[in-house]
């Protein structure tokens, strides 16, 4: 098959393309690298800035690329807003792709109209990016902006139009599947995210790298801040937390960082904290290496790509590991994720337990590696995508 993957989040499309190629298919990834993260792609479609001339150049780049974006058996968009343009300008590009290619699929991989609307019902999820129990998080500044854009604005209208028209919707996490099953059950399926894995027999390094802490507030590797140990004791745990500027409250990393700092203050000789703030993907992976524990998202039921990457590298993940995550995978044995509830105190207690009982770390690391090998192998995931694409009947085009 000839497959076009347009846009990328968390390296999902690039890793999927590599799995498809191993199966003998032709896969092309066109993306901007997910902004500053710099993910690999075959065709670079990056907007340099929002200035007038760079905006005109970007539109011209999109138009000039169109002749190369036709004749594919399958086109999969990472999101209804798959170009860095205003929603009303994206729709003509969607129509062009729809008319000149085979089947059209749109991923449920991130922020969109249906995600916001469903989370705000405060019933579908016990907690999410937009609710904790019956309490809405709509008044938080970052969430207010997302609601205005996706629920009440042009982005939402584009999303509804595209999702109603497309042939199928693969959901990459349990939460996205739970949302889209309510709206488009006949054309939604769950497929785990693909992840590049260490080779069998080539286990990831699970001993701490020899990185000496710097004095407080110093930075290393371009974006890492190391909060040093007191007393020089390196027998404790190294905790790693990645922070995206502007999304800390939305993802809950602000709460997790506060809990982690409390643990460090209480056990200064037993833990080290490494923070990475908005660094490119390859640099992020290097900075993560040698840590013991990754703090992931607070309001998630499931591990997203950063957490899966950490487990593949031999880290323990603290984040989303609710029963629904294991059930949708059919996983009845492994429980590698330290599940946390959306409260600072719960995160503190779970982290404190790891510090006080480090003997559980080796088992969690081994289970994490086996977990990603079982469920996120790129070739196995690519096979599931191929089955979904081939079995999905084409819909009448609007």
Annotate each PLM feature.
Residues 289-302, 315:
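Acidic donor-binding loop of glycosyltransferase active sites
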Residues 160-165, 169-171, 176-195:
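Helix-loop-beta element that forms the nucleotide-linked donor phosphate-binding surface
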Residues 359-390:
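A charged, aromatic-enriched C-terminal amphipathic alpha-helix characteristic of glycosyltransferases
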Residues 316-323:
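Short hydrophobic beta-strand element within catalytic cores of glycosyltransferases
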Residues 63-66, 70, 93-99, 129-168:
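Membrane-proximal helix-turn-helix segments that form the acceptor-binding/catalytic region
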Residues 191-195, 199-201, 235-251, 257:
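Conserved donor-binding/catalytic core segment of Leloir-type glycosyltransferases
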């Amino acid at each position: 098959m000839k497959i076009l993957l347009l846009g990328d989040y968390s390296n999902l499309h690039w890793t999927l393309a590599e799995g498809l190629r191993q199966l003998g298919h032709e896969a092309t990834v066109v993306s901007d690298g997910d902004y500053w993260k710099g993910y690999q792609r075959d065709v670079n479609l990056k907007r340099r800035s929002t200035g007038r001339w760079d905006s005109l150049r970007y539109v011209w780049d999109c138009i000039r690329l169109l002749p190369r974006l036709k004749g594919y058996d399958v086109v999969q968009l990472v999101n209804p807003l798959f170009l860095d343009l205003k929603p009303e300008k994206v729709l003509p590009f969607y129509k062009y792709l729809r008319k000149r290619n085979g089947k059209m699929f749109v991923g449920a991989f991130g922020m969109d109209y249906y995600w916001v609307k469903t989370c705000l019902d405060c019933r579908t999820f016990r907690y999410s990016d937009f609710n904790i129990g019956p309490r809405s998080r709509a008044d938080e500044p970052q969430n207010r902006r997302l609601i205005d854009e996706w629920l009440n604005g042009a982005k939402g209208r584009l999303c509804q139009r595209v999702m109603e028209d497309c042939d199928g919707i693969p959901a990459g996490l349990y939460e996205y599947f739970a949302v889209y099953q309510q709206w488009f059950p006949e054309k939604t399926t769950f497929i785990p995210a693909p992840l590049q894995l260490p080779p069998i027999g080539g286990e990831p390094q699970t001993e701490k790298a020899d990185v000496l802490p710097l004095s407080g507030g110093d930075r290393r590797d371009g974006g890492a801040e190391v909060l040093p140990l007191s007393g020089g004791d390196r027998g404790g745990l190294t905790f790693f937390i990645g922070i995206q500027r502007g999304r800390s409250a939305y993802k809950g990393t602000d709460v997790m960082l506060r809990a982690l700092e409390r643990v460090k203050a209480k056990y200064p000789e037993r833990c080290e904290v490494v923070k990475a703030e908005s660094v490119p993907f390859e640099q992020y992976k290097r900075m993560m290496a040698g840590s013991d524990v990754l703090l992931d998202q607070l309001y998630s039921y499931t591990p997203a790509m950063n957490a899966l990457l950490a487990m593949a590298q031999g880290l323990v993940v603290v984040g989303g590991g609710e029963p629904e995550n294991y059930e949708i995978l059919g996983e009845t044995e492994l429980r590698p994720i330290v599940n946390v509830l959306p409260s600072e105190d719960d995160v503190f207690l779970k982290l404190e337990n790891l510090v006080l009982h480090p003997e559980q770390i080796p088992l969690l690391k081994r289970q994490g590696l086996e977990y990603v090998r079982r469920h996120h192998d790129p070739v196995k995931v690519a096979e599931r995508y191929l089955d979904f694409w081939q079995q999905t009947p084409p819909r009448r085009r609007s």
